[in-house]
A protein has these predicted regions:
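Conserved catalytic-core segment of NTP-binding enzymes
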Residues: 149-153, 160-220
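Short Gly/Thr/Asp-enriched flexible loops that form oxyanion-binding sites at enzyme active sites
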Residues: 61, 153-163, 429-433
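Beta-strand->loop->alpha-helix junctions that form or flank phosphate-binding loops
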Residues: 202-203, 215-237, 258-263, 291-298, ...
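ATP-dependent carboxylate-amine ligase catalytic core
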Residues: 33, 38-41, 67-160
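Active-site-proximal loop/hinge segments that shape catalytic or ion-binding/gating pockets
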Residues: 421
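Nucleotide phosphate-binding/pyrophosphate-handling subdomain across enzymes
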Residues: 42, 138, 143-148, 154-166, ...
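C-terminal helical cap/extension that packs against the catalytic core
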Residues: 205-215, 220-224, 313-316, 322, ...
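Short functional linear segments
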Residues: 1-50, 57-59, 63-70, 75, ...
Length: 434
């Protein structure tokens, strides 16, 4: 049996499984978990689904737990800086040699699974299985914050036995798999709800909220709606984030300050606070008020309205659907109304990029379209044709973003906004920081 001798071989093998595409369903994961001695049942997991806001909510929750002295594992996707960050402990990606060891443990099982009627394991299934094995058998932590990859009901992560579940938001994304309407999409996300396990949600649309609440009632799971039970006031942007007062049924958090910029980050931070309150109520943790404040203030999450350069001002944001783009535009208008906004945009072929471009044109002085090295990336020219803005250019080479930024170097009124895809901003981030 051939095992890998280097990290790069191991990761190349994982990426080669992209050829098997996305195959919703839990049968292969259950098969793998059974043969790995059920690591998914040996961790204290908080399971987070949602169209947008999953990563930021996890970042806030992790930061609060760490401030209170707990060790926290996270499983998130996609990666922004390095592949390793998908499995992290206290914000630190696991080591190359740990990945190599995990892959060598799981590869013989995957080879065996390939020959069964269940069929070949996908890239995401293998990465998810590695995460469960790592947190159960290699590096035990107090809590694991588990982000769904796509949907919820049939997502690979849904073999977990969580102590708490959350849905951040419902919007239009992955509709070919999850359904066209908000209630259909909500039903898929609500598939993470487990019998008797609390579900906390920041979803606000009535039709989606009703579906989630009904599923919780079916499962006899305590149900908490952030927007029905909590209030926001005194909201104002700061230089590095947002300041607001948030009141839950338990207490008031006056003048909370986020370390992440964006009006939507108030909701993500507040959902994290509710998760913390419930973990405390259930007896899992003890957290002081000042640790909540510190955690919210210190949370960081790459690629979410992230400043990567000062001259000219360059921000990266992973907005990749209509709702995400609306939130991004609100953020730019709240924080940078005096700036000339120049957008660098790219997107995947299966995203609603025409609608995203249309929204961006409301705040853009110019748009520069590029493509990037990814199987589903749309061509820059096709994106360019969709725009009605006069000041527009395109280049198929992602490195053209650097020239675009360079040209604005001496313009103090300019702000460069790189957006449209998490995969795209990951590439651009590497280019800029090199």
């Amino acid at each position: 049996m051939t095992l890998f001798t280097t990290y790069h071989e191991a990761i190349e093998w994982i990426h080669s499984r992209l050829a098997f595409g996305v195959k919703p369903g839990l049968e292969r994961m259950k098969w793998l978990m059974d043969r790995l001695d059920h690591p998914e049942q040996k961790i204290k997991a908080v399971h987070v689904a949602g169209t947008n806001g999953k990563g930021s909510t996890i970042a806030f929750t992790r930061s609060i737990l760490q401030s209170a002295g707990y060790s926290v594992g996270t499983f998130t996707s996609p990666f922004i800086l390095t592949f390793n960050e998908r499995i992290s402990v206290n914000g630190e990606p696991i080591l190359d040699e740990e990945w190599l060891s995990l892959v060598n443990e799981i590869k013989p099982l995957v080879d065996e699974l390939d020959d069964t009627e269940l069929g070949a394991a996908t890239e995401f299934e293998i990465i998810t299985a590695c995460a469960f094995a790592y947190f159960a058998h290699v590096h035990q932590v107090d809590f694991v914050l588990l982000e769904t990859g796509l949907g919820g009901r049939l997502d690979s992560t849904n073999v977990a036995a969580p102590i708490l579940t959350a849905i951040t938001s419902i919007g239009h994304d992955h509709m070919a798999i999850l359904g066209d309407t908000l209630d259909q999409i909500a039903a898929e996300k609500a598939g993470i709800i487990k019998a008797g396990i609390p579900m906390i949600t920041a979803v606000h649309q009535a039709e989606a909220l009703t579906v989630i609440q009904h599923k919780a009632e079916e499962k006899n799971a305590p149900f908490i709606s952030l927007h029905d039970t909590c209030t926001f006031k005194d909201q104002q942007p700061t230089e590095t984030g947002e300041r607001f007062t948030f009141t839950t049924p338990k207490r008031e958090y006056s003048q909370l300050e986020t370390g992440l910029i964006g009006t939507h980050q108030m909701q993500n931070a507040s959902l994290a606070v509710l998760l913390i309150e419930w973990l405390e109520q259930e007896g899992y943790i003890h957290v002081l008020n000042e640790q909540v404040y510190e955690g919210i203030r210190q949370a960081v999450w790459a690629g979410r309205f992230e400043k990567v350069q000062d001259q000219p001002l360059v921000y990266l944001d992973g907005a990749h659907n209509e709702e995400g783009m609306e939130r991004l535009i609100e953020t730019v208008q709240a924080h940078f109304s005096s700036k000339q906004v120049h957008v660098c945009f790219s997107a995947l072929k299966d995203k609603p990029y025409k609608q995203m471009i249309e929204k961006l044109e409301r705040i853009s002085s110019s748009i520069h379209f590029v493509s990037f090295d990814f199987p589903r990336a749309e061509s820059a020219e096709k994106l360019y044709v969709c725009s009605h803005l006069e000041a527009k250019t395109f280049d198929e080479d992602p490195r053209a973003v650097l020239d675009f930024i360079q040209k604005k170097r001496d313009d103090p009124s300019a702000m460069i906004l790189v957006t449209g895809s998490l995969y795209f901003i990951s590439d651009v981030r590497s280019l800029i920081l090199q």
